[in-house]
Amino acid sequence: MSVSITPLEDRIVVKPLDAEQTTASGLVIPDTAKEKPQEGEVLAVGPGRVDDNGNRVPVDVAVGDKVIYSKYGGTEVKYGGDELLILSARDVLAKVAK
């Protein structure tokens, strides 16, 4: 998916992965009981923040990376029919190996 959103500073655009639809035992989880996803794919990355010395600090993730992020970090937005999340790179906790 190509996104025409360009995040500013150290922000990234993430498409959250779908939450589990069923439990391990096969029970269907209703939408109201689902946990917020904490894993997603990076769709766009900002240029990085500027530190106190005026140097640009690059972001540690790249487009296409799978990441785990803070449960309540970022701002949810709808764009082009998709639910996306714009969050600071500081809210990213880890990259998931492919």
UniProtKB/Swiss-Prot annotation:
What CDD domains does the annotation carry?
A: cpn10 (cd00320)
Q: Name one GO biological process term.
A: chaperone cofactor-dependent protein refolding
What is the first-listed, main subcellular location in coarse terms? cytoplasm
**ATP-binding: present as a keyword of the record?**
no
Q: Which Gene3D superfamilies does its entry note?
A: GroES chaperonin
- Keywords annotated in UniProt: Chaperone, Cytoplasm
Q: Does the keyword Chaperone apply?
A: yes
Any idea which GO molecular function terms this record carries? Answer: ATP binding; metal ion binding; protein folding chaperone; protein-folding chaperone binding; unfolded protein binding
Ranges that cross the membrane: none
**Task of the protein:** Together with the chaperonin GroEL, plays an essential role in assisting protein folding. The GroEL-GroES system forms a nano-cage that allows encapsulation of the non-native substrate proteins and provides a physical environment optimized to promote and accelerate protein folding. GroES binds to the apical surface of the GroEL ring, thereby capping the opening of the GroEL channel.
Record-linked HAMAP family: CH10 (MF_00580)
Q: What is this protein called?
A: Co-chaperonin GroES
Q: State the organism of origin.
A: Kineococcus radiotolerans (strain ATCC BAA-149 / DSM 14245 / SRS30216)
Q: What is the lineage of its organism?
A: Bacteria, Bacillati, Actinomycetota, Actinomycetes, Kineosporiales
Instruction: State which gene encodes it.
Output: groES
